[in-house]
Amino acid sequence: MIHRSIARLTLACGVLASAFAANLAHADACPAHYVDGRKPEISNPKLDVATQELCYKVFGVMHSGITRTPLWSAEHLTADKLDAAQDLSRENSFHAERKLPAAQRAELADYARSGFDRGHMAPNGDMPDRQSQRDSFTLANMVPQDARNNRYVWAGIEGAVRKMAKKEGDLYVITGPAFIGGNLRKVGRVIVPSHLYKAVYSPRQRAGAAYFIENVDTKQYEMLSIAQLEDRIGIDLLPSLTRQQKLRMLSLPKINSKSKK
């Protein structure tokens, strides 16, 4: 169940959405980041308002003007890209996304003194060059994330997926927030997700699975099939696959939660 605050914002954002209609529909604008070139499909109508797809060189985002976060960030990870990323030092460049309408985007002030990290969905550590790294620091790719969650168990999940991608040769990865339950918070104008997920699909094994974790200081996480995850979040992440294919579980590595960014 999506929090009532999202529903209350839907009407206002719908008016804004019509004003920016030319910018809000970019069907399959960044197919290279998606399995079979097909982007996820939103099945929960409360989420499918004031959305805008943003395409960057190595990842794509579906942004919500209601939550002022991504609904997902999608990547096609390859061993070559990750080898390049490994040699790139981190340079922080957090910034608001000027491609989005001002009323629908997060600003740095929304996160200031909130106690939450600005949590990457497509991680900085996956970025193979400076421009892609800077792109990853857009707030359109961020959610308010529990600081210890972000720096420990989530960092462990990101690192495990990178290692797996190098071993497999390539993986498709979709990362995003989930807004579940009736007690969602806001920081500034940005809605804090209740959970986070990272879905992984291996073309070689023709199987997928996902990490699913509450957005709190925790070491606990679930491993779900893609079908199970889709049922929870209201998004068809891999629309080119059948439900039976989505039930086939990819073996994901267990996480060392001692990791720190």
Model-derived regions, located:
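Domain-level detector for secreted/extracellular nuclease and nuclease-toxin modules, and
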Residues: I2-H3, L16-K261
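Sec-dependent signal peptide recognition
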Residues: R4-A12
